[in-house]
């Protein structure tokens, strides 16, 4: 079952989610719109196991990284960003 990993622009570039991911789904890429000049990216979502460790590691009040398991979407979960 495939999972969707979304990175939102509230990412502060701290790398916590990247370090927490056991399957290396996430990586940091250059991005000029935050203080750290980098943002998380999810180029390998097919490797996501749905553990949500990246979500747990995110220090922002509004989770910058979200994992949607299988058929979950922002709409089905009642979330709109």
UniProtKB/Swiss-Prot annotation:
Membrane protein topology class: Peripheral membrane protein
Keyword Cell membrane tagged: no
Positions contributing to [4Fe-4S] cluster 1 binding: 11, 14, 17, 58
Cofactor(s) the protein needs: [4Fe-4S] cluster
Transmembrane segments: none
GO cellular component: chloroplast thylakoid; photosystem I; plastid thylakoid membrane
EC number(s) on file: 1.97.1.12
Superkingdom in the source lineage: Eukaryota
Disulphide connectivity of cysteines: none
Record's subunit section: The eukaryotic PSI reaction center is composed of at least 11 subunits.
Protein name: Photosystem I iron-sulfur center
């Amino acid at each position: 079952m495939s999972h969707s990993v979304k990175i939102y622009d509230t990412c502060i570039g701290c790398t916590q989610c990247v370090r927490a991911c056991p399957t290396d789904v996430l990586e940091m890429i250059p991005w000029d719109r935050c203080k750290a000049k980098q943002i998380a990216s999810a180029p390998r979502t097919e490797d996501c196991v749905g553990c949500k460790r990246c979500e747990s590691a995110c220090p922002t009040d509004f989770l910058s990284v979200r994992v949607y398991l299988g058929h979950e979407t922002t709409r089905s979960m009642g979330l709109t960003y």
